[in-house]
Regions:
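Extended, compositionally simple hydrophobic/Ser/Thr-rich segments
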Residues: 71-199
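Long, low-complexity, mixed-charge
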Residues: 1-90, 95
């Protein structure tokens, strides 16, 4: 249950939808046996985010394709693709591990044994922080953990950029930039360009 693949990532150029153009209808007959002339269909424009998608004519249809890679987004009735993945709760049994080619914001926590990997920034906004998570890794960005890290000797946090955390307890942190700790670090291994503790 750790790898549930609940995220369906979309590649650049992927099919998002299509429209068949309005055509003339087929004439019918009413109850009196009289011919009823069909009206031509109305052509309705497609609604999509023009920053993340485009339309193209293919095989007599208007097809919407993605300009960027990311996750499918429905915003006010418009289809689009977003580089940002919001998780409105915890990463745990409901979501499985997350591996995303963009940035991630998590409103809750990352539960024990689960992992989050992102190409961009990772923000974990739950006040309780992280307890026993396996891996939190931002390949090119920063990691922001609003609460602290209770690593239980298991948690590893990696960032291509910097790591920002309230406190660290029994965890391993590796950053290409700085590690910024709000209060304290206890029983942890930390490697970074510089380590800043604000007491």
């Amino acid at each position: 249950y750790y790898d549930m693949n609940f995220i369906y990532e979309i590649d650049e150029g992927a099919w998002l939808g299509e429209k068949i153009h309005a055509q003339a209808g087929t004439p019918g007959t009413n109850v009196h046996g009289e011919v009823v002339v069909a009206q031509r269909g109305r052509d309705i424009p497609l609604k999509y985010d023009r920053k993340s998608a485009y339309e193209i004519e293919e095989d007599g249809k208007t097809v919407i394709r993605s300009k960027i890679s990311g996750v499918l987004e429905d915003y006010k009735g418009m289809v689009g693709v977003n580089h940002h993945l919001p998780v409105n709760g915890d990463v745990g049994v409901e979501t499985g591990n997350i591996d995303f080619n963009g940035s991630i914001s998590i409103r809750g926590t990352v539960q024990a044994g689960f992992s989050v990997i992102a190409k961009g920034d990772i923000s974990i906004d739950g006040p309780e922080g992280v307890s026993g998570a396996k891996l939190i890794k931002s390949i090119d960005g920063d990691v922001f953990i609003r609460g602290g890290i209770f690593g239980l000797g298991e948690t590893r946090v990696e960032a291509g950029g910097s790591i920002f955390v309230k406190h660290v307890n029994e965890a391993n942190l590796v950053a290409g930039g700085d590690v910024n700790i709000g209060f304290y670090s206890l029983g942890s291994n930390i490697r970074a360009h510089s380590i800043l503790v604000d007491e």
